[in-house]
Regions:
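Active-site neighborhoods and metal-handling regions in enzymes and metal-associated proteins
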Residues: 1-437
Length: 437
């Protein structure tokens, strides 16, 4: 008989595969099954146990500071979340459910609530670095979370909830929240919109390595666009070309924004969030924002591609406005420098060259896009991150636009601050427009 429980897997149910394996056609047996031999030969690239222990210890330190007895880490599959706290806390990378949940008590074993059951949850157990993985009870996530909190004696506790979605922000499903309140009427639930950012704005070596891998994958995505683009194709086919390039490297695409227009009659300054059915033609320019992730951590690149030689107008704009402006902003990335210095530089570099730009200059990277947001006219940042420190990660995101507001070029690279400067996470040449083919 198999006994995976002896390998350190914690289960709270009694549907041991060894007991029910002869009656798998009974739904009650299959729904909460565990300890099967299924997927035991699956291999995943994971962060080390020491890295997850570091993360959990850091979270518990903030919990103690804020008087929290437990923390519910949340995350979802949408692009404003990309797994968020659940990916960070457990290593889960999965698209099931509007929101997913992990319980981290101040003292005790963390628990992941997984949306699906049966074979799905057994596969998830091999992917994640949390030993206690339980079913979401067919969408009754709040009930599953609440029952675990009761096991932990949290009936009168202060329980934090991280933001699943950085916009809003949004925290969890309404029904899940109501079910938790019903099960724990004397508990106090506290929304913690910035806690995950406080835990992720400084990266460790393993996280930086994952982001560097994501950067290499982003470069491959850009190269796939350039290799595929030709007259007669449609924009969405460029997006289709990115998918195998990224997935062949074990990555995932987070942002896949691609737009095209004629260099002789330009109609875009920024990539299309929804690549269209537009047919590519000779003399087109392709703008893309390609954010790819590896082990949940992302890096982004944006670089223009033309079908045929770039026109003199675009080539001059790129070499005399885009590239030198980017180099000036990049020169500000160093430990001890301030976000305000970046803002001042970014706000003038294109005006000085007779152009203008979208407001965005740079943003932070937690696992994905995050604060701080540095714009030409304002900064949104937490007090502890206004000065750059080693381990902080950023994406320079520039869109220089001509003074009439008609044409522009999106340009982007990702960086990690080091002891001596900045590590380029997307090391791709910047000096020339990329010509397709």
């Amino acid at each position: 008989m198999f006994d995976l429980g002896s390998q350190g897997v914690i289960m709270s149910h009694d549907n041991d595969w060894n007991k029910v394996r002869l009656e798998l056609d009974k739904s009650d047996n299959f729904g909460a099954i565990y300890n099967s031999p299924w997927y035991t030969d699956a291999v995943y690239d994971k962060f080390s146990d020491e890295e997850f222990a570091r993360r959990h210890a850091a979270a518990r330190k903030l919990m103690a500071r804020d008087g929290l007895d437990a923390l519910i880490l949340t995350g979802g599959p949408d692009i404003y979340s990309h797994g968020s706290g659940v990916t960070w806390g457990a290593g889960l990378i999965d698209d099931r459910g509007m929101c997913q949940y992990m319980i981290l008590p101040l003292k005790g074993e963390p628990t992941l609530i997984y949306p699906h059951y049966g074979c799905h949850i057994e596969a998830a157990r091999k992917q994640v670095s949390v030993r206690d993985v339980r079913s979401g009870q067919h969408g009754k996530y709040g009930k599953a979370v609440g029952e675990r909190l009761i096991e932990l004696g949290m009936q009168k506790a202060r329980i934090g909830i991280t933001a699943a979605d950085r916009t809003g922000p949004e925290f969890m499903g309404v029904n899940a929240y109501l079910d938790m309140q019903k099960l724990l009427p004397q508990a106090t639930f506290v929304f913690c919109p910035e806690m995950l950012h406080e835990l992720t704005y400084l990266k460790g070596p393993e996280e930086i390595r994952a982001m560097a891998k994501a950067g290499q994958i982003a470069i491959k995505a850009l190269q796939a666009v350039a290799a595929t683009a030709r007259p007669g194709m449609r924009e969405y086919q460029l997006a289709a070309a990115v998918a195998p390039a990224v997935m062949n490297e074990g990555g995932r695409y987070h942002l896949l924004m691609i737009g095209s227009t004629s260099m002789h009659d330009p109609r875009i300054i920024f990539p299309n969030p929804n690549p269209s059915h537009r047919v590519l033609r000779e003399g087109d320019i392709i703008l893309s924002e390609l954010a790819m992730s590896y082990m949940g951590y992302s890096a982004k690149i944006g670089h223009p591609v033309t079908i045929g030689k770039p026109t003199e107008k675009y080539n001059t704009f790129f070499k005399e406005v885009v590239v030198p402006g980017f180099e000036e902003v990049r020169g500000q990335l160093k430990p001890g420098n301030t976000l305000e210095a970046v803002r001042k530089t970014g706000s003038r570099v294109f005006r000085d060259r007779g152009a203008q730009s979208r407001p965005t200059i740079m943003h932070g990277l937690d696992l994905i896009t995050s604060v701080p947001f540095v714009r030409a006219d304002r900064i949104r940042a937490e007090p502890y991150e206004t000065t750059m420190q080693p381990g902080m990660t950023y994406n320079i995101e520039l869109t220089p636009v001509d003074k009439e507001g008609i044409f522009g070029i999106f340009f982007s690279r990702s960086f990690a601050i080091t002891e001596n400067g900045a590590l380029d996470l997307t090391p791709f040449p910047v000096d020339e427009i990329l010509v397709a083919g």
